[in-house]
Amino acid sequence: GDIGAHFRQAIGDLRHIHIWPENHTRNPAYEANIESLKTILENEGYAVTIGILDVEEGLPVSTQGAIPDLILLNNDLTSGPLPDLGVPILPPPQMGWYQRRKSDHFKAAQPLLDEVANLLDIDPWLLSTHWVVSEDKCLEKETCRTLLAAEVDNFLNHIQAKYDEFGIEGKPTLFVKNDSGTYGLGILEIQSGEELLNLSNRKMNRLTYGKGGTDAENFLIQEGVPSGLSWDSMVVEPVAYCANGRVGGWFYRANAKKGEMANLNSPSSIFISPSEIDDDSIRSRRNHWHMLVAEIAMLAMAAEAKN
């Protein structure tokens, strides 16, 4: 399959792959995902082991007592970089969230989105989102937050003009989130600068709490995009699995307790296989627009890694 071909192209001949997962295992869906990945790789003919390795000891040793040919990272490395393990690692560990920033990804993606929009003769806004970064703990400083609130209102007015231009109903929403890391707890939805000015201590604490207890300092303030898809009375959004720059598989995140402008990644979300959703319009969007944006994101990630 695509994943096996990708590994053979990147690494060459290999037989033993070790999956390095996240440290926490409280999420049953995450555990199921890791087991599915293991099964996919085993079906490709690889010996597969799973576990956090003690990198203090030098070369990693698997549970079978052998050094793997490849370490497959399924850990975002928020806690810090890995030492030189003497074993090939994919994805590249320098893409870990100890130094990566979401805003860097969107900077890398924008020229690609502009180019594709030009080829399709459409407004680039239809493929992308507007965003700004708040630096240096600005949200904790009253003067800085006041200036940022005014910028947020201008931001929302600009998006409202786009809504009016394209006949989009609803009120624009912005998401405020840590510019580093993948932790989903501290994501805030706002629809006015005043909401930013009047943040409660509870919301501020959630926003600034990073994975592993590290404090968030820089925040990405980004235009929210309506999910636009529904199935069985639930809002749904596609999630793509990609390898070697191509989409290799999908699933859907669905949430009966959230609206189309909300963050669906919450404890009430469920995951649905594409085979369970018999809807031509959802399938068509997934195979065209969603696949296009996902593969542009892969190109942007390659540009990030190069830089």
Give each language-model segment a name.
Residues G1-I168:
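Conserved N-proximal alpha/beta basic substrate-recognition cap immediately N-terminal to
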Residues T49-L53, K102-H105, L120-P124, M204-Y209, ...:
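Short C-terminal domain-edge/linker segments immediately following a structured domain
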